[in-house]
Amino acid sequence: MKHPSLIFLTGFSGSGKSTIGPLLANSLGYDFLDLDKEIERQADKPITRIFAEEGEDHFRERERAMLESIVGRKELVVSLGGGALQNNDCFSLIISSGTMVYLHSSPLILAKRMSHKTDRPLMKGENGERLSSEEIEKKILALLEHREPRYKTAQIMVETDTKRIGTTVEELTRKIERYVRRAEKNQNSHSQTKKQSRK
């Protein structure tokens, strides 16, 4: 069953999911789960090592199994990995079980934020070398071309380029609370209609 209060934060790496997620969960009074960090905890190694040693397909399988374990929960904010939606099984689980929120940032801003990180596969070239900011931006543009159509299927979207984190959290809290109320009301009305039709 779909639970509107199961919130999936999606967006490219560097869009603010891991920073905004726990603050948003606290504002809503929900629990919080960072999917990538939970996968790292269970695997007992960072994502860069999972990719290097097991390959992306195996990482996506871990991701799918983790998502299956939380389907059905309510009042939970989940920060997804940047590429989670590209796995068809993961995408189907997400859209059928909760509410998706897209944190949108421009490629230039994403590249600037990513240049400060060293723990992401995106930062590395084919031979494991560190990429320049310009190379990262080109890589982001290429990946966004494939990923953005699914990002844009989200029920809620906010820009995270220039807003303060607190402002973004407040905006998201209002939008999510309004959306969840409306969705739950529609679900209840639908349930009542089905019950009456059985009489």
Curated annotation (Swiss-Prot):
Its cofactor is Mg(2+). Pathway: Metabolic intermediate biosynthesis; chorismate biosynthesis; chorismate from D-erythrose 4-phosphate and phosphoenolpyruvate: step 5/7. Its EC number is 2.7.1.71. ATP binds at residues 14-19, 120. Keywords: Amino-acid biosynthesis, Aromatic amino acid biosynthesis, ATP-binding, Cytoplasm, Kinase, Magnesium, Metal-binding, Nucleotide-binding, Transferase. Residues 179-199 are annotated as: Disordered. Belongs to the shikimate kinase family. Catalyzes the specific phosphorylation of the 3-hydroxyl group of shikimic acid using ATP as a cosubstrate. This is Shikimate kinase. It comes from Chlorobium phaeobacteroides (strain BS1).
